């Protein structure tokens, strides 16, 4: 299959095909069996076959592969969906529980000064007031290319359901990010700054009497999306929060209340000031239909967050490109700033603490075709059960072509009780040490490799393994 318009783009954008037929012939010869979404390039193939420019056998091959997939899927014997099977798969208690669990496990705790988890008083005791503020507080943001579930739970609704009558909840939108949230709309208009500043004043008034603030900010589906055409853009020149969201945070921070920021977004944001001044930060990404309940589960300690960042979060757009497995370079740094990211790849905190020890190897020397077992001790040094993800990285000390400074080769998320220690074992096979050499061959070169382990890509302990010498 081709991506949408990829075949016609050979003519329209990349200028490597003179006509639709030219693009179609090249795609067919490369093994592409279907032209999506309109088929406007492959529509030329019938005439090309009749006139001898494309062999009919090439069409037969593509059709045979497509029909084989349909046969394997049983679509000829039973081409219709089974409504009863569909009902068992989605929109039921089991599916909603799975969505909630997925959201719970996806959240990444970036900062916590002890503000989290929130404690609730006993029934009948004095009630705290929690201000739930922000443009992503009362809406469930599902991201791009999403289905439309019958029921979604916002952060506001999840918190209300969790606290019941044991806390007072006040809400204010704070700001609008965009004029509307329609992901499909071509035009994106930012909300009016003057109107937003009026909303900020309302949020400050609502939060003034609160004991703590939950601030849900980040993206809408419009500000973090695929830009699939010149009239449907998605890229931005900045990683800063869109619109007046930073102003909203600053105004709430001036109240002197503990602030927990919940980020709902589709890409990393540059939040240096918030990272410094917020009391707690949760990176949620897009949490799905049960996201509001899952956020409440984490805020009130029913679930101990254990997610890890799948990307590096830079301090500013000027640090880009920024990724953990960069190549060695002469990049020396910046005037007035650091090359260190705001949060490294693989980072994530917990309501407990862990100690990830130095790795040990089953052998310090192995042949080129050999494997090694890496054992990493991890101990829960805190007072409650929690998850830690042990990560193993490899670095080739000297190689014939430049390689990344570290490459993630294995990881495992483990749940440990307070005080529990576990040895987490990984087997690294020859594939873990392979590289493409200057002859474009996938090989293992003899030499020393650093085997590094830790809780994230920036805090690693290393041992040396000799391969093939």
Residue ranges and their predicted role:
Residues 1-13, 17-18, 26-28, 32-39:
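Short acidic/histidine-rich active-site segments
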Residues 4, 8-11, 17, 42-54, ...:
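C-terminal non-catalytic regions of proteins with extracellular/luminal or membrane-system context
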Residues 22, 58, 418-420:
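An acidic, carboxylate-rich microenvironment
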Residues 31, 38-77:
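Long, well-ordered, tryptophan-enriched scaffold segments
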Residues 33, 40, 73-76, 80, ...:
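Membrane-targeting and insertion segments and their boundary/processing signals
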Residues 39-41, 61-62, 77-84, 118-120, ...:
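Short coil/turn segments at secondary-structure boundaries
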Residues 57, 71, 77-108:
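Helix-enriched interaction subdomains in cytosolic or periplasmic regions
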């Amino acid at each position: 299959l081709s991506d949408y318009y990829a075949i016609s783009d050979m003519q329209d954008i990349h200028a490597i095909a003179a006509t639709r037929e030219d693009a179609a012939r090249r795609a067919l010869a490369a093994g592409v069996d279907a032209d999506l979404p309109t088929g406007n390039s492959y529509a030329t193939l019938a005439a090309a076959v009749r006139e001898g420019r494309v062999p009919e056998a090439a069409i037969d091959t593509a059709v045979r592969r497509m029909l084989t997939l349909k046969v394997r899927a049983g679509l000829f014997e039973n081409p219709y969906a089974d409504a009863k099977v569909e009902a068992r798969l989605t929109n039921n208690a089991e599916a909603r529980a799975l969505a909630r669990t997925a959201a719970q496990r996806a959240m990444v705790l970036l900062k916590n000064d002890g503000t989290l988890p929130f404690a609730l008083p006993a029934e009948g005791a004095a009630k705290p007031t929690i201000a739930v503020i922000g443009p992503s507080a009362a809406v469930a943001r599902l991201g791009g290319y999403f289905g439309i579930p019958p029921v979604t739970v916002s952060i506001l609704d999840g918190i209300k359901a969790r606290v019941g009558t044991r806390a007072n909840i006040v809400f204010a939108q704070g700001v609008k990010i965009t004029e509307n949230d329609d992901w499909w709309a071509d035009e994106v208009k930012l909300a009016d700054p003057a109107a937003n500043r009026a909303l900020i004043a309302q949020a400050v008034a609502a939060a003034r009497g609160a004991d703590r603030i939950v601030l849900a900010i980040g993206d809408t589906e419009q500000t973090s999306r695929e830009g699939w055409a010149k009239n449907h853009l998605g890229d931005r020149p900045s990683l800063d929060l869109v619109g007046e969201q930073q102003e909203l945070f600053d105004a709430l921070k001036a109240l002197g209340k503990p602030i927990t920021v919940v980020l709902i977004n589709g890409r990393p944001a540059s939040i240096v000031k918030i990272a410094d001044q917020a009391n707690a930060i949760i990176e949620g990404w897009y949490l799905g239909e049960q996201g509001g309940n899952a956020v409440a589960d984490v805020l009130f300690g029913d679930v101990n967050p254990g997610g890890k960042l799948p990307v590096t979060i830079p301090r500013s757009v000027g640090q880009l490109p920024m990724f953990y497995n960069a190549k060695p370079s002469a990049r020396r740094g910046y005037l007035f700033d650091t090359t260190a990211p705001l949060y490294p790849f693989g980072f994530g905190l917990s309501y407990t603490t862990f100690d990830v020890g130095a790795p040990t190897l089953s052998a310090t020397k192995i042949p080129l075709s050999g494997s090694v077992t890496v054992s990493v001790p991890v101990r829960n040094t805190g007072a409650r059960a929690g998850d830690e993800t042990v990560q193993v990285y490899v670095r080739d000390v000297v190689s014939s072509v430049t390689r990344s400074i570290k490459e993630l080769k294995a990881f495992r998320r483990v749940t440990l009780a307070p005080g529990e220690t576990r040895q987490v074992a990984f087997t690294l096979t020859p594939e873990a040490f392979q590289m493409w050499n200057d002859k474009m061959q996938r090989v293992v070169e003899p030499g020393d490799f650093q085997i590094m382990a830790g809780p994230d890509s920036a805090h690693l302990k290393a041992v040396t393994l000799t391969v093939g010498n």
